[in-house]
Amino acid sequence: MALTAYLPYAVTIGTSFLRSQVIEYPMSLVRLAHELPIEAPRTAWLDSIIKGDCVSALERLSDHSVDVIFADPPYNLQLGGDLHRPDQSMVSAVDDHWDQFESFQAYDAFTRAWLLACRRVLKPNGTIWVIGSYHNIFRVGTQLQDLGFWLLNDIVWRKTNPMPNFRGRRFQNAHETLIWASRDQKGKGYTFNYEAMKAANDDVQMRSDWLFPICTGSERLKDENGDKVHPTQKPEALLARIMMASSKPGDVILDPFFGSGTTGAVAKRLGRHFVGIEREQPYIDAATARINAVEPLGKAELTVMTGKRAEPRVAFTSVMEAGLLRPGTVLCDERRRFAAIVRADGTLTANGEAGSIHRIGARVQGFDACNGWTFWHFEENGVLKPIDALRKIIREQMAAAGA
């Protein structure tokens, strides 16, 4: 099944690859929280649904064990009664017991507890996505910042087919808000597949407003009576974009409010691991059947375009240590206007000054900055080649070694 079957954009195949792997899923996806030890090893819960309360179930996961979190917490809608259409038919709204809290203070305490537990299990370079409506997302955002998470973006999910405002007393509520945050301000190494998102968006930067329909049709899970299995089932395309943007094949995706299993189904299809937490048995049953029916995509279909920033860093000394350049080699720019000599310590010298390939490249041109990898060239069989070609050789060796 092609990724475009439920993505509104195509995955662009690039020449730089993120390693993929074949993931084996357990025959039984369900684990009981109380039967797992505190901070259980990864093998005890990976690619499974943990049945239990969100916070207590999170205690079963070890520190820094997940790469990305997607959380769709209770909205705390405060409906105050049934909703009816103009024809007096009742609107299927969220009125389940799990969405009811006695006060804002109780909701804030609940939010703080699960966010603290999530922060413990999130890797230092991991990120968290939280989705909500105007009823709860601002309260959740406050807790995120108070606990030290660092906000990266807020994303507006614009719904192509939102529910009307039947009473005509407010604007039609046509969007939900996602908050994307790193574990803390120091979390600089988080995954963001910028080039893949740009390529998927007709080579234009992906914006922070996303247009998707709400979950309908054959994707919407129904019970034997034709009723919705879960009132807030999210579209697979939304989860797919999140995972394609902020994770790599083989990463672990945590969903502490698993519901009908959209996160697990998309993770399996996209070659990611998952762990879900859910306490309601009907949702667990639906999610289990759904995930078991998913066929993962192949490695070629999961190739993600990456850019220079996503590639492993290579020091200039590594080029010398590999024997690709020797001390005393003369480098020049592509027009042979400037020259510098390679020294044994990995620096260059030119005009009586020594420094890095970048610093000396800038100095000889009278610039403040320079990319030495593309500026400096070496000569091979009478042909000038950028030293970046040597860096590429090192990166290929690193990839072959699994680095």
UniProtKB/Swiss-Prot annotation:
InterPro entries: DNA_methylase_N4/N6 (IPR002941), DNA_methylase_N6_adenine_CS (IPR002052), RAMA (IPR040843), RM_Methyltransferase (IPR001091), SAM-dependent_MTases_sf (IPR029063). It catalyses: a 2'-deoxyadenosine in DNA + S-adenosyl-L-methionine = an N(6)-methyl-2'-deoxyadenosine in DNA + S-adenosyl-L-homocysteine + H(+). The keyword DNA-binding applies. Residues 297-399 form the RAMA domain. Keywords: DNA replication, DNA-binding, Methyltransferase, S-adenosyl-L-methionine, Transferase. Signal peptide: none annotated. GO terms for molecular function: DNA binding; N-methyltransferase activity; site-specific DNA-methyltransferase (adenine-specific) activity. It is an enzyme of class 2 (transferase). One of its GO terms (cellular component) is cytoplasm. Its EC number is 2.1.1.72. The keyword DNA-binding applies. Pfam families: N6_N4_Mtase (PF01555), RAMA (PF18755). GO terms for biological process: DNA replication; methylation. Belongs to the N(4)/N(6)-methyltransferase family. A beta subtype methylase that recognizes the double-stranded sequence 5'-GANTC-3' and methylates A-2 on both strands. CcrM-mediated methylation has important cellular functions. Contributes to the accurate cell-cycle control of DNA replication and cellular morphology. This is DNA methyltransferase CcrM.
